[in-house]
Amino acid sequence: MTTILPNLPTGQKVGIAFSGGLDTSAALLWMRQKGAVPYAYTANLGQPDEPDYDEIPRRAMQYGAEAARLVDCRAQLVAEGIAALQAGAFHISTAGLTYFNTTPIGRAVTGTMLVAAMKEDGVNIWGDGSTFKGNDIERFYRYGLLTNPDLKIYKPWLDQTFIDELGGRAEMSEYMRQAGFDYKMSAEKAYSTDSNMLGATHEAKDLELLNSGIRIVQPIMGVAFWQDSVQIKAEEVTVRFEEGQPVALNGVEYADPVELLLEANRIGGRHGLGMSDQIENRIIEAKSRGIYEAPGLALLFIAYERLVTGIHNEDTIEQYRENGRKLGRLLYQGRWFDPQAIMLRETAQRWVARAITGEVTLELRRGNDYSLLNTESANLTYAPERLSMEKVENAPFTPADRIGQLTMRNLDIVDTREKLFTYVKTGLLAPSAGSALPQIKDGKK
């Protein structure tokens, strides 16, 4: 079954995910002038660099849209972001700094909610601005077809006629000007930025070079903490969770998770918290590089993980982290609503997150520099008296108990020695006098 249309379907309704930028503006106008009936759909994702959402549909109508809709995706975006946080669905990290999968979460929400809106309007052909080299083309493809099985895909950037006529930004700008729209290209940055209220992604152009780094980036959700001229004061912050849901910051309760995340963004952003530089594997297995911002999610995740480690046992934490890495990869691949992802996500939400009730206090300084100051929860299994170095009444175990426990360890120690001796005999191990391995001469002794 062919779902991708190589040429413009003239005379038919075509929905386009419309950002208001030059690419989608030129594409919409071009589709109308070539005989299609374009419908424009704009997702309000709380992008920190978008000053006026209401203006975007108005521009789409000016460029020839049959209809233009602004779809408020903020509540769903935050709900999915918190679900990812609860499950630890983050598989990309470098030296302890995490990428919070903010773009994949945004695509899951956009890809389903915009296609659902199109379906309501009887629009069954969808186009967007993703290129054939990136992840988004596959994410949108999957989410679109999951939402509307009758969906057809038309992408101007896969249409050779469109490419021949409007192959670059200069050509698009001139095309708009000749059509009577004084569309001026914005000043070219040294990199590309994509954002939603969960986080921002900076990539491409100069950032494709590994000798260009974070110092060329102008943060849109925080501050350039690496610049000595930027003044940042240390700040104490408290974060409270109830049954896995963040509910309060600095003692102020938020009934609306969207408002809570916005405040978390403001707090974390004042310090540049949550910025990271990652080399990652795209869905097609080629490596790319991105610099990411996620101040609010980073703040919430620090507090959440602190409570996780204080409440759950070691095996639960290990399973949560293993499943989280698997789920993070599925999310990255555009499989957030696949059965295997739902299974992992709901397991974490039920058996890990529901126990996470408590409050964490931390001090934020510059960038990702912070200290944990206090952790409080009625569900803590951390009990310092169990291991206190001081004499305590009614100690949970005695020296005699520990002797018994150590004696039982002899069983596996003997087995381990025999295995090591077997490896020596087969030549797998040949410890020398300077080796840190035990000097095994007889597996029975």
From Swiss-Prot:
It is found in: Cytoplasm. Keywords: Amino-acid biosynthesis, Arginine biosynthesis, ATP-binding, Cytoplasm, Ligase, Nucleotide-binding. Belongs to the argininosuccinate synthase family. Type 2 subfamily. It comes from the Bacteria. InterPro entries: Arg_succ_synth_type2_subfam, Arginosuc_syn_C, Arginosuc_syn_N, Arginosuc_synth, Arginosuc_synth_CS, Arginosuc_synth_type_1_subfam, AS_cat/multimer_dom_body, AS_multimer_C_tail. Its EC number is 6.3.4.5. It is an enzyme of class 6 (ligase). The lineage of its organism: Bacteria, Pseudomonadati, Pseudomonadota, Betaproteobacteria, Burkholderiales. L-citrulline binds at residues 99, 135, 139, 192, 201, 203, 280. Homotetramer. ATP binds at residues 17-25, 43, 129, 131, 136, 194. It comes from Bordetella parapertussis (strain 12822 / ATCC BAA-587 / NCTC 13253). This is Argininosuccinate synthase. Pfam families: Arginosuc_syn_C (PF20979), Arginosuc_synth (PF00764). L-aspartate binds at residues 131, 135-136. Pathway: Amino-acid biosynthesis; L-arginine biosynthesis; L-arginine from L-ornithine and carbamoyl phosphate: step 2/3.
